[in-house]
A protein has these predicted regions:
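Beta-sandwich/jelly-roll carbohydrate-recognition scaffolds of carbohydrate-active enzymes
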Residues: 1-225, 259, 264
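C-terminal substrate/ligand-recognition segments
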Residues: 225-227, 231-238
Length: 269
């Protein structure tokens, strides 16, 4: 498994099927759970499964609702579908290509001779079309799984290598101070997260995002950040060090904070 900013890239290996058995290789995708109505679509010609889900974990934290919020996905498979169908609760609907409701899912099966399948899943908070665009931009067919693994490694090593540690006493492996430090730095560099999505290319160009304060989709020239550490003030203070290592995004983060203030007329920092 590897990833890009808005794409997950998975490689599934299937054991060889035994003769006279029905152990066909398959992948199942859960689209919605109880009390949440979503959609799912199967396109066997393009070898894609797509859908949407309005569930969000913070829905019970306050009176505000976001009727325009949904998470969208497009999963593209490297092998053709031998068969497929929709699950709706306990109901199995073979050869059905779309569904709407709770407890919704989809399965796709492959030829019994298939022993490996790659799945590239683009995600978006804007639309299914944008999820597909994210997939095409960040994980085109020309980029192999192994290429994606190396690109992700290089991206993180470039950031973590900005700090070099010397003179640390070696201790037991599970208490190695360097491991603890770099793990904390890795976690710190993930937030606040860039919530915007590319409209043209990975680097540069206009971007789009879902804005929770207005429950609308927006566009702009800059990135838009979310996932702030605002529960307790000292947690944001801890963020100063990771932010010092990424000065290229500081202006965008501050612009987003000002935008949040203007939208809600209340400071977020």
């Amino acid at each position: 498994m590897t990833a890009a900013s808005h794409v997950g890239h998975l490689r599934f290996g299937f054991p060889e099927s035994k003769p006279h058995t029905s152990n066909e290789p398959y992948v199942f995708i859960q689209a919605t759970r109880q009390n949440w109505t979503g959609n799912i679509f199967i396109d066997s010609e393009s070898q894609e499964v797509s859908g949407s889900n309005p569930q969000r974990q913070d829905y019970a934290l306050g009176p505000y609702r976001a009727p325009g919020f949904s998470g969208y996905f497009v999963s593209r498979f490297s092998q053709p579908f031998a068969s497929y169908g929709i699950t709706h609760g306990a109901s199995l609907q073979a050869n059905t290509t779309e569904g709407t409701g709770e407890h919704l899912g989809a399965w796709v099966k492959f030829d019994s001779s298939c022993n490996e399948v790659e799945v590239r899943t683009g995600v978006s908070f804007v639309s299914i079309a944008q999820a597909r665009k994210n997939l095409d931009i960040e994980a085109p067919s020309s980029v192999s799984f192994d290429d994606a693994v190396e690109t992700l490694k290089e991206a993180w090593l470039e950031k973590l290598d900005r700090v070099q540690i010397e003179g640390v006493n070696e201790t037991a492996a599970e208490y190695d101070q360097r491991t603890i430090f770099y793990t904390g730095l890795f976690h710190g560099l993930q937030y606040p997260s860039d919530f915007s999505e590319p409209l043209e290319t990975i680097e540069g160009g206009r971007r789009t995002w879902y804005e929770g304060y207005t429950d609308q989709v927006r566009e702009g020239e800059d990135s838009y950040y979310q996932s702030w550490s605002i529960w307790v003030g000292h947690r944001y203070a801890i963020r100063v060090f990771p932010d010092m290592l990424t000065p290229n995004r500081t202006l965008s983060v501050l612009n987003t904070a000002c935008l949040h203030f203007s939208r809600r007329n209340a400071s977020t920092v």
